[in-house]
């Protein structure tokens, strides 16, 4: 018997993040000009440009859904793994990290038709979804390793490599560029930049992009676990306060029972149940209450105010709960109403028993239509009407 052949599953593509910058934009030129200053300068430069896209704190409400250019792209490599990125202009490798594990690169695509523009993605996130800051991270040291910055922002797509190619190298088109790439891999520095071979290529990048597919926005991705101290170096604290996630909401815990509240006023009101404090007194009878709402309900007894009225009959009530209970009676009346006597019932069981009582009161029923009568004479008189109708139809 032939043994079953086990076929190994192909490895899943690594999830990465991407930053696409128009080559003719100011950020693209600054990245090429300041590339020799190291990876930290590039991160700082990107975040400074991201800061210019954010609205002013005075013009933004914390609860408003704002579309920002900060977009989280968790599955970029799975959707773009088959695309080819020719001519990588800037290649960034962090020091002390293996190339196949931590590769941070910037690709300025030479082919405008291969550009994946912001309109094609159609992914928008509000400020609360863009940057989430864990409150436990606010106590981290400012001397945190710079590797968190490298993990925070990836400027390339680390997709699957073609067969037969070195995973540490990117595809090239000519021999001159292949020689430059091999020299770059041998250098110990963390940053190597190359320029396009001619000016025609640069002009084509700037002029041949279709108008409908022009990249208008800067896409930056930042991990949710970015430390607050690290992010505050580039972004204003007031803006960070606007972009905090719901998970950073402070909870106020009662020390006696452990119950939590999201507002301090709720905690203070709750603690009065433990202490027995009643700071609200009635001006008419002097009775004390621990909540202001309970005092308002009590004062309506003295004033006779009934602000809640029934929408069916117009009856007024002092409390909204009393009105709701009363309106339920009208609803049940419409459902369980006897067609014989017009009596209403709050429950279906009572309504069925009432209908059976009508049947017991009328033991004589017509064999033709099923109508019931309390007396036999009335039933026989009714049955004659059916026989009279038949004789008329026969004539």
UniProtKB/Swiss-Prot annotation:
PANTHER family: FI01424P (PTHR23226:SF416), ZINC FINGER AND SCAN DOMAIN-CONTAINING (PTHR23226). Residues 157-208 are annotated as: Disordered. Coiled coil: none annotated. Keywords: Metal-binding, Nucleus, Repeat, Transcription, Transcription regulation, Zinc, Zinc-finger. Pfam families: zf-C2H2 (PF00096). One of its GO terms (cellular component) is nucleus. Localizes protein arginine N-methyltransferase PRMT3 to the nucleus. Highly expressed in testis, weakly expressed in spleen, thymus, prostate, ovary, small intestine colon and peripheral blood leukocytes. The keyword Metal-binding applies. Residues 246-395 are annotated as: Interaction with PRMT3. This is Zinc finger protein 200. Interacts (via C-terminus) with PRMT3 (via zinc-finger); the interaction is direct and required to localize protein arginine N-methyltransferase PRMT3 to the nucleus and inhibit its proteasomal degradation.
